[in-house]
Design a protein with these regions (language model features):
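Charged, compositionally biased N-terminal leader segments and the immediate start
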Residues: 3-35
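Aromatic-anchored, charged helix-turn/loop surface patch used as a conserved interaction hotspot
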Residues: 6, 43-129, 179-187
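Short acidic alpha-helix initiation/capping motifs at coil-to-helix transition points
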Residues: 21-26, 38-39, 60-65, 133-135, ...
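Residues that cap or delimit alpha-helices
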Residues: 25, 77-78, 164
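Short secondary-structure boundary/capping segments within folded domains
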Residues: 34-36, 75-76
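Residue-level signal for inorganic ion chemistry
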Residues: 40, 47, 141
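Conserved phosphate/anionic-ligand binding catalytic regions in large, soluble enzymes, centered on
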Residues: 42-43, 145
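C-terminal non-catalytic interaction appendages of large macromolecular assemblies
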Residues: 118-187
Length: 187
């Protein structure tokens, strides 16, 4: 790695969020981070608690640190909390999107890959696959769609529908972490 590369890597690692999380009030913190994990404020609440008891609270002021801590909170949560986290996610190109009921983040993510501009046939295909997936796994198909194409999303559905429930549960949690990472990077 070159010296320039080392400085770039250091700068990335040391990226300070717009408002230092360790210096925010609880209300400010929740406003900024509650939506990182879709409709799962408990993740940000637990992170806030960790920051408050930390001797070195400024260690939580980088994107990488916040991301790692939030991921750790989710990974150590019990099964029921993780299942609720998965079920908090909307269907891709689903009825909530049509009704305008998505969070701003989900709306932006789905629109960014054209899921708001599907043909009637594509929409029906998404509905069928969403329904089949939920019938088998009891949570919605979750994929970090940023940068993906509709074809890649359809392929993701098709390649994952044959997974075991345990394998797909773990895959879905990992996709949620990717989504959270994208959301944090945008802060």
């Amino acid at each position: 790695m070159t010296l320039v590369g080392l400085f770039e890597a250091r700068d990335k690692i040391m990226t300070i969020l717009k408002n230092r999380p360790s210096a925010l009030s609880k209300d400010e913190f929740m406003h900024q981070f509650a939506g990182v994990y879709e409709h799962s404020d408990w993740v940000a609440e637990l992170l806030w608690d960790q920051i408050q008891v930390s001797i070195e609270s400024e260690c939580f002021d980088t994107v990488d640190a916040i991301s790692a801590q939030m991921k750790g909170i989710v990974d150590t949560a019990n099964y029921d909390l993780k299942l609720a986290l998965l079920r908090a996610h909307p269907d891709l190109a689903g009825k909530a999107a049509l009704a305008g009921e998505l969070t701003d983040d989900s709306t932006s993510e789905q629109a960014g890959v054209g899921l708001d501009q599907l043909s009637e046939d594509e929409f029906q295909r998404f509905q069928h696959i969403n329904d089949s997936y939920k019938a088998k796994f009891e949570f919605p198909f979750i994929m970090a769609v940023k940068g993906a194409t509709k074809i890649q999303i359809f392929d993701g559905f098709e390649s994952r529908i044959d997974n075991t429930v345990d394998a797909e549960f773990n895959r879905a949690v990992n996709e949620v972490h990717k989504i959270a990472g994208f959301r944090l990077a945008d802060k």
